[in-house]
Amino acid sequence: MSITDGSRVGIASPHIFPDGTVDMAQVGRFVRRAEELGYASLWTQERVTGRPTLLDPLTFMSYIAGLTSKARIGVSVFVLTRHNPVHLAKQLASIDQMSGGRLIVGVGLGANADDLLIYGLDPQRRVRRFVEHVEIMKALWTQTPVRYSGDFYELDNINIDPKPVQSPHPPLWFGANADAAIRRAVRMADGWTGAGSSPRDTFTARVKQVHDMLAEEGRDPKDFPISKRVYLAVDDDEKRALRRLKEWCAYYYGNADLPERVAVWGSAAKVQEQLAEWSEVGVDEFILNPVFDMEEHLEKLAELTGLS
């Protein structure tokens, strides 16, 4: 059974280094080989503070853009309100140019509102700030000059150049879980992405909700891709696979119990079967996320998903 019949297959690039040692040689080997194998997209994510040793996504995407030529390059997700929207719009337009129009921009509010205090921002107004960021970035990517008056930003005859390669702009995929956030995604975004920490039953319900809201807004679901990050481990020794997933989730999330609710593990046949089930739920693009033995998983996952 191949999951590629109904879903595109992307993969998380090595950008988290639990042993504390950043291995750029591995990154280079991985992304080049991923493109050779036919993966549709290469992904990173954002976390600024905390325990994980994790590379900055803007810098990382710029780097792998120069190592690849076909695979799309995505982040899932930026906590958008941490960033200045003018500066971020310029950086992302530059990466879209550098990659030849291959950028996907995942954005979200973030799970911890109080995190914004680090940046001198009021967490109580983060939703309004998020909306302004999206509006400003879209305007800067598509208009010259831009005039904008909001609660937080005033732009008077501002422009950025170069504009992105993609027209009208790089796709914005919102990470969203709450009802209001999903409604906002359907109205403002170009796609929706389910978190790696989202169990299948929750994700399934959210997919239905997205489709219902798209119908209400008069939008075609064919033009609104749904993606899902899936943590996984291919190993005939299921106990060992689960143990290693638990160790990684304890490191990254502080929650060793998470894999039993959200991850896929076991033999190649079992992982293939479970990914096919995820595909049937409504995943248009997988962000497959192995958490150890990255290069070995790159090959195994290409085979079991039908890429090679």
Question: Model-found features: residue ranges?
Answer:
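N-terminal beta1-alpha1-beta2 module of alpha/beta enzyme domains
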Residues: M1-L67, P168-P170, V291
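Flexible, glycine-rich active-site loops centered on histidine and acidic residues
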Residues: S2-D23, T81-Y148, F152, A195, ...
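Acidic (Asp/Glu)-rich catalytic clusters
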Residues: S2-I3, R32-E36, M61-K70, L92-L103, ...
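Hydrophobic faces of well-ordered beta-strands that scaffold small-molecule active sites
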Residues: V9-S13, L42-T44, I73-S76, L103-V107, ...
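Active-site mouth loops of central-metabolism enzymes
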Residues: I11-A25, F78-V86, Q166-N177, L232-A233, ...
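Short, acidic/polar
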Residues: T21-A34, H87, Q91, F174-R184, ...
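Conserved, mostly hydrophobic/aromatic
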Residues: A34, G38, I64, I95, ...
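Alpha-helix-loop-beta-strand connector modules within alpha/beta enzyme cores
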Residues: L55-V75, V131-I136, L140, A302-S308
